[in-house]
Amino acid sequence: MMTQPHIPSVMSDLRQDIVQMPKVIKECSGIRIYGRRIRSILFTTDVSIIANHDADAILAVYPFTPIPAIIKSIMIVASVPVLAGVGGGLTTGVRSANMSLLSESEGAYAVVVNGPTTVETIKEINK
């Protein structure tokens, strides 16, 4: 029987109150994006939470028209991959495509579109 190796842990008084994912999440297979295994995804746009968590990725979608400043702010504080919302509901076409380009240039791992996204918008994003 193999014993679990001891893994040293470093914390400080200033960063001890972080949003922690359930330990059982480490038992799932997860998904691999660009060679990085992601088991836990934190769904938030709150930059204070994005800066203080132990999730493997951030899902940053919100019910408003995507704004470059919000995506930039999230990307600045995120220390893990970000999956960025770029519209698809009311925000479509060239605007969604431009937000996708901005998200990619800021370092987002992927973009996320809403359910009612049209095929034309997907094609525009894919260009």
Q: What function would you assign to each model-found segment?
A:
Residues 2-84, 88-127:
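Alpha/beta enzyme core
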